[in-house]
Regions:
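N-terminal pre-domain/capping segments
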Residues: 1-86, 160
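Histidine-acidic metal/acid-base catalytic patches
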Residues: 1-3, 17-23, 81, 85-95, ...
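Hydrophobic faces of well-ordered beta-strands that scaffold small-molecule active sites
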Residues: 3-9, 30-34, 58-62, 99-101, ...
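Acidic-and-aromatic substrate-binding clefts and catalytic sites of carbohydrate-active enzymes
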Residues: 9-18, 33-46, 66-75, 103-111, ...
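Short amphipathic alpha-helices and their capping/turn segments at secondary-structure boundaries
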Residues: 39-57, 111-118, 147-155, 177-189, ...
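Short, hinge-like loop/turn segments at secondary-structure boundaries
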Residues: 50-52, 76-79, 117-118, 142-144, ...
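Active-site regions of enzymes building and remodeling cell-envelope glycoconjugates
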Residues: 55-56, 122-124, 210
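Active-site acidic/histidine proton-transfer and metal-coordination neighborhood
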Residues: 69-160, 245
Length: 257
């Protein structure tokens, strides 16, 4: 496999530190993509210990809409930039391979671009989104879900691109496009980073199924994801005590690549 494989964890996942060390030493994965939960800086020294003592590399995923960061909402600018400062701490102190942001949900593309341009002293990538996400009483539209808006963000913000194949599939299905052709089109935007999980091939809503539990042609997807360097596995975790399911997913991916 030509990618560096990423294990997705959250900054509060102290329960996974021991198995993460074990799997790294067994070469099951190459780096950790750490979701920086807001107000969790007290956990940063624990992750720095993994980096220093076990030589584990890190990437950072910034908080997104569900954790309170929404670049598309002008009323959240001050809060968004405060969360960005926490993200910078994680990225700088862990010497992150990359840092990923979502553009926002429910607001305007112009506002997302305006706020993302205000993130200073941090090199980052934007991640493409599904077209819609379920909310409490309805559905909301995501910023950065169609090709033109993604291309515009990359051009005007000047950031890198993280291609989430599952998000792309959901967006394509909502737009009435062939999902595999859409993934191939997005790959022309030269992503450095990929995210992958399984889902129903016709899904419009995102899911993070284990590989083989959905109907996506994952071997075909992997053939389309060419040119990038990092591939983070975003499947669900079944246990709070171990990462055995991640071993299965990682091996599955390697077997079909």
């Amino acid at each position: 496999m030509n990618y560096k494989i990423g294990l997705k964890l959250w900054s509060l996942n102290e329960n996974y530190i021991a198995p993460a060390i074990d799997l790294f030493e067994r070469e099951v994965y190459d780096y950790i993509e750490l979701y920086a939960v807001p107000n969790s800086l007290e956990m940063l020294p624990k992750w720095k210990t993994l980096a220093k003592e076990h030589k584990i590399k890190f990437a950072i995923h910034a908080p997104h809409f569900s954790s309170g960061l929404d670049f598309s909402n002008p009323n959240k600018l001050k809060h968004n930039l405060m969360l960005c400062d926490e993200v910078k701490r994680y990225s700088n102190e862990l010497e992150a391979l990359y840092t990923v942001f979502h553009p926002g949900i429910g607001g305007s593309l112009n506002e997302s671009i305006r706020q993302m341009k205000m993130v200073q002293n941090l090199k980052f990538a934007m991640e493409n989104k599904p077209y819609i996400v379920p909310m409490n009483s309805s559905e909301a539209f995501c910023i950065g879900a169609d090709f033109n808006s993604i291309a515009r963000i990359l051009d005007e913000v000047g950031c890198e691109f993280c291609l989430d194949a599952g998000h792309a599939l959901c967006s394509a299905n909502y737009q009435g496009l062939n999902p595999y052709e859409y993934i191939a089109k997005l790959n022309k935007l030269n992503p450095k980073i990929y995210h992958i999980s399984d889902n129903d091939e016709n899904a419009k809503l995102d899911a993070h199924m284990h590989f083989g539990d959905g109907s996506i042609d994952l071997a075909r997807v992997l053939r389309l994801l060419r040119g990038g360097e990092f591939l983070a596995i975003e499947t669900i975790k079944d246990s709070k005590d171990n990462l055995d399911d991640f071993i299965i997913d990682s091996n599955y991916l390697k077997s079909i690549s």
